[in-house]
Amino acid sequence: RHSNTGTEEDQTHSERTRLELQEMVSVNESFHLAGLIHLHRRVFCLPSSSPVIQENVKLVLKALSGVRRGGTAESSLLFPMFSAGCEATDPADREAILERLKLVEGLGMTYVRNARNLMEKSWETGKSWEGLVKGEFLG
C-alpha cells in the first residue's frame, strides 16, 4: 500500500508558502498606500475629505483583505491601519478598520489599544491625531 503523505505535505507546504507570499505583497501594498496618505496629507496639505485620500483609505482596506485575520502578519499592520483609520471619513471604512484594530488589540498589544483610542478621539473631535498628541490627549 502506497501513501501520498509526502505529496500531500508538499502541497500543504506549497499552499502555505503561496499564502504567506500573498500576505507579504498585501502588507507591502498597505504600507505604500499609508505612505501616500501621509504624503498627500502632510506634504500636499490635502484635507481628509479629499477624494485622493479617501481612495487610498479604501485601497488600504482592500490590501488588508489579503492578510489573514489573526495571522502573524496582521500584527505588523498598525501603521497602515492607523494611518488609513485616522483619515477615513466613510463610517463603513471606519468600522472596518476599527474591527481589524480590535482584533490585533486582542492579541495583547497595548500600544494598539492606545492607537485605537487616539484614532477614535480624532473621529470624535474632528482633529488630526497629530494635533491631539501635541495637545491634551496622550492616550
Language model regions located:
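Amphipathic alpha-helical elements of HEAT/ARM-like alpha-solenoid repeat scaffolds that form extended
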Residues: 75-82, 113-117
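Intrinsically disordered, low-complexity regulatory regions with latent secondary structure
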Residues: 4-7, 29, 101-139
